Design a protein with these regions (language model features):
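Catalytic cores of the polymerase beta-like nucleotidyltransferase superfamily
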Residues: 1-269
Length: 269
C-alpha cells in the first residue's frame, strides 16, 4: 500500500520542532489496515484508524476526496491518488508529505511557504472557510504558535467569513484558544485577533494581557462567556487567581490561604 506521513509532523520536522502527533495517509482502507495493524477503528466510517504508541499518537486515514460538508462533517469518497488527497487539507504548510524512507515530497509549495513564514490556504480560501470555519481559528493558531504571517488572500477570506466561527462548538473553540494562550506570541496574537474582530465574535474581552506559562493564569485575565467549557479544576484555579488579583498584592496571607503556586502565577500578572 502507498503511505505517507502528512501534516503537522512533517511541518514541524522541517522547522526542527518536536511533534508527537503523527498523521498518515494511505491507499489502504480501514478494513485492509486492520488485517495487519491493531488500533481503534471506531472512526471506520470516516476511513480512520487510531493507534497509540506513547509518546506518539498516530492517526491513519485512507486517501479521500471530500464531496460536501454538513456541520463540519464532510461526505467523502475514498481514492487512490495522494495528490488529490492533499488538496482537501487546510494550508500548504500542512500538506507536505514524507515517505517511508524519510524523503520529503511537496506538491503545493508548502516548503517555500514555511521559508516565507506564510499561512496560505490550499485552493479557494472562501470555500475552505465556508466548508469548515474551524480553519479560521487554526490559521490564527498557527499565526500564534509558529509566528507566521497570514497570506493576503487567506486573510481577506478570514475577514469575510469570520462570523461563521460563532457556529463552532465551545469545546472546539477552547481547544484552539488553549494553544494560542500557551504560545510564545500570545499577547501579539490576541491583540491581532482583537483587531480582526475575532474576539468580539467569541465574546472574549480583556483590558491588559500578560504572558504567563500557565493556561489558567492566561484565562484568568480574560472576560469570557459563562458557558465556556472549563473543567471543574480549571474553573477553581481561574477563580482563585482572579480572587488574588482582586486582593491586589501577594503577602503571607495569600501564600497561606492559596499556596505558593497560585501566589507565583498571580505575582507574574
Amino acid at each position: 500500500y502507498e503511505s505517507y506521513i502528512v501534516g503537522g509532523y512533517v511541518r514541524d520536522f522541517i522547522l526542527n520542532k518536536k511533534s508527537y502527533d503523527i498523521d498518515i495517509a494511505t491507499s489502504a482502507t480501514v478494513k485492509e489496515m486492520t488485517t495487519f495493524l491493531s488500533g481503534n477503528a471506531s472512526s471506520a466510517h470516516y476511513g480512520a484508524l487510531k493507534i497509540s504508541k506513547p509518546p506518539y499518537n498516530i492517526d491513519i486515514t485512507t486517501f479521500r476526496r471530500e464531496l460536501s460538508y454538513q456541520k463540519r462533517n464532510p461526505t467523502v469518497c475514498y481514492i487512490k491518488d495522494v495528490k488529490e488527497d492533499i488538496l482537501r487539507r487546510d494550508f500548504t504548510i500542512n500538506a507536505i508529505l514524507m515517505d517511508k524512507n524519510g524523503n520529503i515530497i511537496d506538491y503545493l509549495g508548502g516548503i517555500q511557504d514555511i521559508r516565507d513564514k506564510k499561512i496560505k490556504c490550499i485552493g479557494n480560501p472562501n470555500e475552505k472557510f465556508q466548508d469548515d470555519p474551524l480553519r479560521i481559528l487554526r490559521a490564527l493558531r498557527f499565526h500564534a504558535t509558529l509566528n507566521f504571517n497570514i497570506d493576503s488572500a487567506t486573510l481577506t477570506a478570514i475577514k469575510k467569513y469570520k462570523e461563521l466561527i460563532s457556529t463552532l462548538s465551545k469545546t472546539r473553540i477552547k481547544n484552539e484558544l488553549d494553544k494560542i494562550l500557551l504560545s510564545e506570541n500570545v499577547v501579539k496574537s490576541m491583540d491581532y485577533m482583537k483587531k480582526l474582530g475575532i474576539l468580539k465574535i467569541l465574546g472574549i474581552t480583556y483590558k491588559k494581557l500578560v504572558k504567563v506559562d500557565d493556561l489558567c493564569g492566561m484565562y484568568a485575565q480574560l472576560e469570557l462567556p459563562n458557558d465556556f467549557p472549563f473543567t471543574k479544576k480549571e474553573q477553581s484555579n481561574i477563580k482563585t487567581i482572579q480572587k488574588i488579583l482582586k486582593y491586589g498584592k501577594i503577602d503571607n496571607t495569600v501564600i497561606y490561604e492559596h499556596g505558593l503556586y497560585f501566589a507565583m502565577i498571580t505575582g507574574l500578572i
